[in-house]
């Protein structure tokens, strides 16, 4: 169960980061202020919820086990940027993502 909470905390944290990115996107219309407030508000909600879940994780797992699992954030952000904004991800970056996933698997199996 705590593994699900950890993944959810990670996803909400990433959601907050992605909302911040979306807030910086240029608009061609005059709705810039509304756009900015919407996305920054969503970012705050996501990051606040992530923090609450993270505190639940820390009550259960040692920080030495829990914290490295947040490396998943790098994986989620890379995938989202690639799919949502069609950002270019060089092969070297994909290799890094694969190494992060491998590290998480190794650390997770030791827990």
Swiss-Prot record:
Compartment(s) of residence: Cell inner membrane
Keyword Transmembrane helix: yes
GO BP annotation list: lipid A biosynthetic process; lipopolysaccharide biosynthetic process
Domain of life: Bacteria
Keywords assigned: Cell inner membrane, Cell membrane, Lipid A biosynthesis, Lipid biosynthesis, Lipid metabolism, Lipopolysaccharide biosynthesis, Membrane, Transmembrane, Transmembrane helix, Transport
Pfam families xref list: EamA
Chief site of localization: membrane
Annotated GO CC locations: plasma membrane
Pathway: Bacterial outer membrane biogenesis; lipopolysaccharide biosynthesis
Domain EamA: 40-109
Topology relative to the membrane: Multi-pass membrane protein
Transmembrane regions listed in the UniProt entry: 38-58, 61-81, 91-111
Family, per entry: Belongs to the ArnE family.
Function noted in UniProt: Translocates 4-amino-4-deoxy-L-arabinose-phosphoundecaprenol (alpha-L-Ara4N-phosphoundecaprenol) from the cytoplasmic to the periplasmic side of the inner membrane.
Protein name per the record: Probable 4-amino-4-deoxy-L-arabinose-phosphoundecaprenol flippase subunit ArnE
Organism: Salmonella paratyphi C (strain RKS4594)
């Amino acid at each position: 169960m705590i593994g699900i909470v950890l993944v959810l905390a990670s996803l909400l944290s990433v959601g907050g980061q992605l909302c911040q990115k979306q807030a910086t996107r240029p608009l061609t219309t005059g709705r810039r202020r509304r756009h900015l407030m919407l996305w920054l508000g969503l970012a705050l909600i996501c990051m606040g919820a992530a923090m609450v879940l993270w505190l639940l994780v820390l009550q259960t797992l040692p920080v030495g086990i829990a914290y490295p699992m947040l490396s998943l954030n790098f994986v989620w952000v890379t995938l989202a940027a690639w799919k949502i904004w069609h950002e270019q991800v060089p092969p070297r970056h994909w290799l890094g993502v694969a190494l992060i996933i491998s590290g998480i698997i190794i650390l997770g199996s030791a827990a």
